[in-house]
UniProtKB/Swiss-Prot annotation:
Highest taxon of the lineage: Bacteria
Binding site for GTP: 19-26, 81-85, 136-139
Gene: tuf1
tr-type G domain segment(s): 10-206
Region (G3): 81-84
Any one cellular-component term (Gene Ontology): cytosol
Protein species of origin: Rhodopseudomonas palustris (strain HaA2)
Subcellular location per the Swiss-Prot or TrEMBL entry: Cytoplasm
EC number(s) reported in the record: 3.6.5.3
Catalysed reaction equations from the record: GTP + H2O = GDP + phosphate + H(+)
Protein name from the UniProt record: Elongation factor Tu
Broad class of enzyme this protein falls into: hydrolase
One Pfam entry name: GTP_EFTU
Keyword entries, A-Z: Cytoplasm, Elongation factor, GTP-binding, Hydrolase, Magnesium, Metal-binding, Nucleotide-binding, Protein biosynthesis
Amino acid sequence: MAKAKFERTKPHCNIGTIGHVDHGKTSLTAAITKVLAETGGATFTAYDQIDKAPEEKARGITISTAHVEYETTNRHYAHVDCPGHADYVKNMITGAAQMDGGILVVSAADGPMPQTREHILLARQVGVPALVVFLNKCDMVDDPELLELVEMEVRELLSKYDFPGDDIPIIKGSALAALENSDQKLGHDAILELMKAVDAYIPQPERPIDQPFLMPVEDVFSISGRGTVVTGRVERGIVKVGEEIEIVGIRDTQKTTCTGVEMFRKLLDQGQAGDNIGCLLRGTKREDVERGQVLCKPGSVKPHTKFKAEAYILTKEEGGRHTPFFTNYRPQFYFRTTDVTGVVHLPEGTEMVMPGDNIAMEVHLIVPIAMEEKLRFAIREGGRTVGAGVVASIIE
């Protein structure tokens, strides 16, 4: 079946829902599509559909972040809904990395919870530029003073992680009320107010479209009769159908050709920075590509294993380590979409690193990763984030 061409008329923005498990992230995502569907800006997507991430299910491989698209009068949005459980933190990291802005969902009945804090920290870590808060389940709280208290708590928490807590819009409402049409003000109207805040407060991202093409590989599919499709979000630049590209990282660099680009099941003649695309690769086998590699313009990025980094090690209270670590510490380094084991070498005169420290360190990875200065990473142990860092300089 021929696919419809994807029209680019409005500016595009990637956002997503973050927050504690069961605070209503997926319900809110469904509610946004329901309310915007009234004006033709979306197709209503029910909770259980989002929960199942339908577009990936069709290919027999599931991606744990669900994508929906919708538009307001000002913008076109691609919205990711990240699962809330702590063991999905890996996807939270890739999900949050896919955001020009985030909607932090906090239950008014519970207030901020451990994952609220963790997701704000992760948003800060992966460089989400702006957050808007939806105080959900307000229909369950009768006391206006209690609502104010929760709002204050949320603002304090945001400020603690270097978001402008005093300025961030906080919209009070109920996703369920919007889905069930039970309370116009807390439901329908609050959702419209939220979208207004998202339009106004989340800055239109400047797309690094003029830089050389780079796309981190998130998933790889084999589509019968068409070949291998690699999905991910284009980090920068443009890939045109027919262009030669390189697959860099983890293994030896390979050359291939992009023979097709699709977005939301529609064909494009090119994919550009900010787009979530599937890229069809000529002559590349499913097993030749894996999550953690990047597709890029030939020669633009090299794989490296040794670099100097500036890192922040989380405190115990932030969910980090309880004990110090020493030279030859071997955690995982989470680059873009994957964990790679590496060995830490501390600078002369630094005996050990305590939770809460900032540290300049040298890292030797066991496999090469496509990297450049300013690339961010998380430091993890057994699936738990224990630090955040940035590549300061490359050694080799």
